[in-house]
């Protein structure tokens, strides 16, 4: 099995190694096995390292995009090309270089998660039952419900721990020593067990590289939380990711403050005032629209079917259709503006609307339903075509030809 240099030194960025195996994974991928590596393989909820191998100063870099491990092999996945097959013969000496920016960020996230999980377990007895670390997000699942106050308290304690700059120690205890150690573990582990300890905070079984001291994490922020399978899922960001997220949100908050002429610490109150003002204006607008539609309905000439389109939706559609239905022998149909038209159809004189619904579904793909002389739903289509179809149905007593 490949010697795992990342187990010994998580800060090792470059190393020398020798090719001991080359495998065709599929048509596009080769698996390179070396005698030693600093590349961390995917595992423990964390994506693998990336980087490159170098044969010499002339040969182009061989990019490593993924690293996988099983009970027998640790393979670095590279492009299955003729050049790489020639360059990676058994015995070839390579110089490896990992993507340090990704590695260090991953270590910040993972070490921060250990502190978080240790504190949650100590305070509330909840277990970490799920962890996912990728370039897009970091999630931690606990088997108990954390309140907003709980999360704020935990976040504060995590950052206090980070700023104490405690040493993080990783080692493989003997089977005898292991019997006397209490540690966290999400699953049973076959083979040698590696423990990661943060003094007085957490001891957890873990295969991944970690920062050397908690101070290197910098900062942990819980950016989202939700109930999940009877417990709690937290989204966290640490270190550079936390700083970038905070900077982006601060920038957006600044823009909002400028638009609303509000201080950055008062944007919520400013938005709340704007929302209340908008709600009042919307309420007044609906009232005005309702009055105008009532006046409009008085000018409509009675017909077999009245089919109209208005720039409104919701209760206004129904209210206007109800007014028009008094003047329609068959029914009144009112549609909203736009391509995705909402509609309400009302019959007050016994005209059956089931055939109307059937025709709208088959001709225009409408999604609709109703009862008691009322049909409502939505469809996509040209209003003129819909109106012509409905007028034909009304004239023919319920069927369109």
Q: Can you describe what each PLM-predicted range is?
A:
Residues 1-401:
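A glycine- and charged-residue-rich anion-binding loop/surface
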């Amino acid at each position: 099995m490949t010697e795992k240099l990342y187990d010994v030194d998580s800060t090792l960025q470059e190393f020398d190694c020798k090719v001991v195996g080359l495998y065709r994974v599929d048509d596009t991928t080769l698996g390179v096995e070396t005698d030693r590596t600093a590349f961390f393989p995917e595992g423990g909820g964390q994506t693998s390292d990336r980087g490159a191998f170098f044969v010499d100063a002339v040969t182009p870099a061989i990019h490593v995009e993924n690293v996988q491990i099983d009970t027998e092999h640790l393979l670095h996945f590279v492009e299955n090309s003729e050049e790489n097959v020639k360059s990676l013969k058994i015995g070839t000496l390579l110089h490896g270089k990992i993507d340090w920016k990704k590695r260090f960020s991953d270590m910040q996230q993972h070490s921060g998660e250990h502190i978080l999980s240790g504190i949650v377990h100590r305070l509330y007895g909840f277990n970490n039952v799920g962890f996912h670390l990728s370039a897009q997000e970091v999630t931690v699942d606990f088997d108990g419900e954390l309140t907003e106050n709980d999360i704020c308290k935990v976040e504060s304690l995590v950052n206090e721990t980070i700023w104490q700059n405690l040493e993080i120690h990783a080692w493989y205890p003997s089977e005898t020593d292991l019997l006397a150690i209490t540690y966290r573990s999400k699953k049973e582990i076959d083979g040698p067990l590696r423990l990661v300890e943060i003094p007085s905070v957490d001891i957890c079984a873990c295969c991944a590289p970690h920062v050397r001291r908690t101070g290197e994490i910098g900062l942990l922020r819980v950016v989202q939380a939700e109930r999940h399978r009877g417990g709690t899922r937290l989204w966290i960001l640490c270190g550079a990711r936390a700083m970038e997220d905070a900077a982006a949100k601060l920038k957006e908050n600044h823009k909002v403050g400028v638009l609303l002429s509000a201080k950055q610490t008062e944007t919520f109150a400013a938005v709340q005032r704007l929302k209340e003002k908008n709600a009042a204006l919307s309420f007044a607008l609906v009232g005005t629209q309702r009055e105008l539609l009532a006046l409009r309905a008085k000018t409509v000439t009675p017909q077999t079917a009245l089919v109209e389109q208005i720039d409104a939706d919701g209760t206004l559609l129904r209210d206007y259709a109800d007014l028009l239905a008094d003047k329609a022998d068959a029914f009144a149909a009112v549609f909203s503006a736009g391509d995705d038209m909402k509609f309400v159809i009302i019959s007050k004189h016994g005209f059956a609307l089931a055939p109307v619904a059937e025709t709208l579904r088959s001709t225009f793909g409408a999604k609709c339903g109703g009862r008691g002389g009322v049909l409502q739903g939505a469809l996509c289509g040209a209003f003129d075509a819909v109106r012509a179809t409905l007028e034909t149905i009304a004239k023919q007593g319920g069927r369109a030809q």
